[in-house]
A protein has these predicted regions:
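AMP-binding/adenylate-forming catalytic domain of the ANL superfamily
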Residues: 339-362
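Gly/Ser/Thr-rich phosphate-binding loop
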Residues: 162-216
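AMP-binding/adenylate-forming catalytic core of the ANL superfamily
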Residues: 258-343
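ATP-dependent adenylate-forming carboxylate-activation enzymes
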Residues: 20, 32, 48-57, 126-146, ...
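Conserved ATP-binding loop and adjacent catalytic segment of the adenylate-forming AMP-binding
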Residues: 193-231, 237, 241-250
Length: 364
């Protein structure tokens, strides 16, 4: 029986993939979705031989490739930047397993995180189910109906689907944003059979750290390639892709990701340096404020931004999606129990949706 490779609008098998690479299948008509064409064409461009016999032959050929892949950064705080990353670096942490996994593709497939999920499925001959571009009700249905077993997504995306139980899911992976123990504990209620992983990756260098909680350590193999300086993560040029947009300090690149140490070796990712604002003399982390509000009963998702103020320097403005049965008045009252005075938003409004990037991060 031919194994299913990709499910989007159509079901594409591994034989279909091989036939396309060999010129025996045309996808350039309106029947195929943009994602289906992009995935098949991306793989074909990484193949240097004129004829592929089977999946094993395909993987052997791809692993020998010297090709680079064009990636875009997430564009969370501005226009995405272009990075060129080698295929070898992109698959360096992928483990081959015989588990018949079904992966949910929540990320945009032309970003680092999307490529890594794609290649994880491809190298293991697993099935990939596209979730990107579908609304949350459709996503919930697709997770269940297609028997998705593995999900990699941002904390924000998980928050939006936590109103039903998914017993079929075996592994949950966080990435792309600050995570918290509170969210990970909540996840266990809705994904009762899933183990939880937390990944730190960047478009510039790929996957770098992994843990089962919310703290990380620098792996031994990267000890001389990653440093923490002024509470920010810096990467050496040897592990970073090529780009005309990156600003260097000698051989080092500042990711802008902030950490706080919990002991000599372990640290937490606490957000982006661009999300620190001054309010009345205090440094306020917008992501930390969001995390605190997110803990409150009734809060489904919250976004905090800042606006310049002549008296305080900045004020905080919030958008919130809450569950039925809860009021904004109650949520505001409870904020005083978890926020410092200078962290309380001056303005807070209820919205039906919060704008996200293509990768499922809150867009600021």
């Amino acid at each position: 029986m031919d194994k299913i490779f990709l499910i989007d609008k159509h079901t594409i098998t591994y034989n279909d993939l091989i036939h396309y690479i060999n010129g025996q299948l045309s996808i350039w008509d309106s029947e195929y979705t943009e994602l289906e064409r992009f995935v098949l064409d991306t793989i074909k461009r990484l193949v240097s031989e004129p004829y592929i016999e089977n999946h094993s032959h395909l993987i052997d050929v791809m692993e020998d490739t010297n090709g680079n892949i064009e990636l875009r950064t997430s564009g969370t705080t501005g226009e995405p930047k272009i990075i060129y990353q080698s295929f070898e670096k992109m698959i360096r942490n992928i483990k081959l397993k015989d588990e018949n996994m079904v992966w949910g593709l929540f990320y945009s497939v032309d970003r680092m995180a999307g490529y890594q999920v794609l290649f994880q499925a491809l190298l293991n001959k697993d099935t990939l189910v596209n979730m990107n571009g579908y609304d949350y009700k459709e996503i919930q249905q697709r997770i269940v109906s297609y028997g998705v077993t593995h999900i990699s997504a941002t904390p924000t995306l998980y928050k939006m689907i936590l109103d039903r139980v998914y017993p079929n899911v075996k592994q949950i992976t966080f990435g792309g944003e600050r995570s918290s123990k509170e969210l990970q504990h909540k996840i266990s209620d809705y994904f009762p059979n899933a183990r939880v992983k937390n990944i730190y990756a960047s478009t510039e260098a790929g996957s770098l750290f992994a843990s089962n909680g919310d703290t990380f350590t620098i792996p031994k193999k990267f000890m001389d390639k990653i440093r923490i300086k002024n509470d920010e993560i810096w990467l050496h040029k040897d592990i970073v892709g090529e780009s005309f947009h990156m600003k260097w300090d000698g051989d080092w690149y500042n990711t802008g990701d902030l950490v706080t140490f919990v002991n000599r070796n372990e640290f937490k990712i606490v957000g982006r340096s661009t999300n620190i604002v001054k309010i009345g003399g205090y440094n306020v982390n917008l992501e930390l404020v969001e995390s605190k509000i997110q803990q409150l009963d009734g809060v489904k998702l919250v976004k905090i931004t800042s606006k310049e103020n002549s008296v305080l320097g900045n004020i905080l403005i919030g958008e919130i999606i809450h569950y039925d049965g809860y009021s904004l008045i109650d949520i505001k009252r409870n904020m005083k129990n978890v926020l410092e005075k200078w962290e309380i938003p001056t303005k807070l409004k209820v919205v039906e949706s919060i704008e996200l990037t293509e990768n499922g991060k809150i867009k600021r």
